[in-house]
Amino acid sequence: MADYTPMMQQYLQIKEEQQDAILFFRLGDFYEMFFEDARIASRELEIVLTARDGGAGSKIPMCGVPYHSVDNYLARLINRGYKVAICEQVEDPREAKGIVKREVTRIVTPGTIIEEQLLDQAKNNFLAAVEEEPLCTGIAYIDISTGEFWLSEIAGENARSRVESEILRISPAECLLAGSGSLTGSWEEEWLRQQNITLTVWDELPLSLERAESLLLRQLQVASLESFGLKSYSAGIKAAARIIAFLEETQKTSLQHIKSLRCYSSDNFLEMDFYSRRNLELTATLREGKREGSLLSILDESRTAMGKRLLRRWIEQPLREAGEIEERLDAVDELKNTLSLRTELTPLLSRINDLERLGGKIGASVASPRDLLGLKSSLAVINDIKKALQPCRSEILQRLAAMDALEEVFALIDASINDEAPLGIKEGELIKTGYKQEIDELRELSQEGSNWLVEFENREKQRTGIKNLKVGFNKVFGYYIEITKSNLSLAPADYHRKQTLVNSERFISDELKQYEEKILGSRERLYSLEYQEFIKIREALIPYLPRVMETAHAIAILDVLQGLAEVAYQNNYIRPEIDNSGKIRIRAGRHPVVEKALREARFVPNDLQLDRDKARFAIITGPNMGGKSTFMRQAALLVLMAQMGSFIPAEEARIGLVDKIFTRVGASDDLAAGQSTFMVEMIEVANILNNASDNSLVILDEIGRGTSTYDGLSIAQAVSEYLLENSRSKVLFATHYHQLTRLAEKLPGIINLSVSVKETGNTVVFLKKVLPGKADKSYGLHVARLAGLPEKLIIRAEDILQGLEKNKDSRPAPTLLQPLLFSDSHPVVDELKQLHIDDLSPREALQLLYQWQKMLDDK
């Protein structure tokens, strides 16, 4: 190292501590990268790789990016999975004795982004941590840009799959795992990476419970965790503390806006596994992963960034407690039926900036003057919102009418920060005139200097006779006099040449140099004083941050409720009745997304009645394109919407509270994991069988079609009987196995439904209407004709079909239904009675299905 230049030695010393990150090393107006970092950055950022003299004749690979556009380059590296260490100059180069002092001021990872340009305003950017203990698993997650900090624990039956589902619901940008955790190194690690979640194995400090509690108490600035209801959450506390320790290591500063930690239980929310969330297209479409076409895109009429993020959370975490749901419905009801209130609130909400992330920037000490002005302009409308809410009667709206307007914060910013303040904080013009006398005096002196420069320029024009003479300034030479080459002969003898340009020469004079020292001295003092005063003002806002965050949350709730009311009004939604009856009764229900996509065409509404104690299992038959999948997804979405507190598209609805929604729809190979369509299907079915309860809603679409006909039919029937025997879940099961419709004659609780078709000659019209009874045929050839298959092929297929139908009676009929699979005398029943279902993995459940199928075939 001794052969390197002093600056390069400094770089290598700092890089030694940042081996796993690309080091952005500040040199003047650029961030430079060297050695392997430079090669990586050059390739990933598509910037030129050059070389620099490192000492002793060595050439070191180098590339760089301008500091003022660093966010763009930072985003590209983070999105590609790199960590970036930001190394800044921490002293004024003019005051440095030798090499300018530099330090890593922050390490940027996917879960620690605070730059506004790198964040999606409608989505949280969570950093999560998982801590496993023998009896439970703790999950914590934080969005440092908003200050939201959550903690939970999962234990009991099927805890592992519930942990995975919860992580995927949170959808963190980054997940911290302890190196000793059982998640690490298992297939889940690669699986989570496929969900674009960066996994960071980080166990630099072994966390005892005592150490974890100490970290949290220091961050939250409280004497006991009991005030947050956390005392018994040992695994959750360790997960939360791991996050805080990681942030202390990477952010190099105290995050003053993180003063609250909220715990929750997944038992309070309607549960959906990863497959169900994906299949129902709650926040993104299944095929393209786009927001447009999802339920979120239909329900989002929010006007604020906080509201958009909260709406996403409500969709992903519907409630299970009737009282909370009714509170939300009361508020939506009142807003929907009070047009004048919505008309008044909408423009007011539109004027509110992202208070959560503004508070986060203040807490992280990165807020600019314009951020403070954004906070002020948002607070300016709070009292108008409170006034509009005063007449409201619903409980939530009454609470929101009492939100904190933070008058002290508004007054401080209004009195101190210049309304036209620049984006930066070191160029002056930050502080209002009249706020601080010393700043006013320096500003006046600086202004006098500017006036003197104008006067000096005019005087020199007269003295020299050079009409286009001008006085300018740059950081290298300071103030100068510029004369075009055509007028050089008129330059006075007391001008001293400093710089030659293509078309002009630049000079200085003794008088200008003397006044420059006075002007620049006062201006530097002014800028320095304004900077110091701004920092004081920003720090003075920190004690108010908990109140800012509370007001931000209140605005978010109001915004979501207002948006749901607007959607209900515009789309003719009705208020569902919520109870614990175990029944789902929907009259003229409509699919919220499909009906909007139809535009001109009219969506065909359908009724649905399921009863946990009576007809709880509907087998749905009929042709493809008939509307079976839409009908089933519609049922799940309407239940979900009702339990999140939204009105729903129907004429009437009674929703008995559901604890879990499961969906198995569509076919998709998981090639990356080496799993076929059928394997994926069976894993999803096993998950449903292991986890469905008496209060669950199960959606099954074409179970068993990924294998041979008899294999598929036997599995489909076995699944149906298992659900009937082992739970009272409400089930919608669409199938092409018409043999299954006979189950309704033999098993109580099963009903048949079918999608109606109008047939005229060789043409069919799919009426999209779901009616009682079974379908008499599948209309597969009609669908093939509609799809545009050659007519010659269709005619040949019809001939083959007729031949098969003539011969079907000559073949022995399948014995699947005689006797029923789960009749008391069958050996499978004996195995089931001895089986501990909760201990089965999906793979073990699948193996059992194959084993039972073989027993059936042998018999």
UniProtKB/Swiss-Prot annotation:
Pfam families membership: MutS_I, MutS_II, MutS_III, MutS_IV, MutS_V
Keyword DNA damage carried by entry: yes
GO molecular function: ATP binding; ATP-dependent DNA damage sensor activity; damaged DNA binding; mismatched DNA binding
GO annotation, biological process: mismatch repair
GO cellular component: cytosol
Domain of life: Bacteria
Binding site for ATP: 622-629
Signal peptide (UniProt feature, chain positions): none
Keyword DNA-binding appears in the UniProt entry: yes
Disulfide bonds: none
Coiled coil: none
CDD domains in the cross-refs: ABC_MutS1
Keywords: ATP-binding, DNA damage, DNA repair, DNA-binding, Nucleotide-binding
Function: This protein is involved in the repair of mismatches in DNA. It is possible that it carries out the mismatch recognition step. This protein has a weak ATPase activity.
UniProt record similarity statement: Belongs to the DNA mismatch repair MutS family.
PANTHER family (UniProt xref): DNA MISMATCH REPAIR PROTEIN MSH1, MITOCHONDRIAL (PTHR11361:SF34), DNA MISMATCH REPAIR PROTEIN MUTS FAMILY MEMBER (PTHR11361)
Record-given protein name: DNA mismatch repair protein MutS
Species name: Syntrophomonas wolfei subsp. wolfei (strain DSM 2245B / Goettingen)
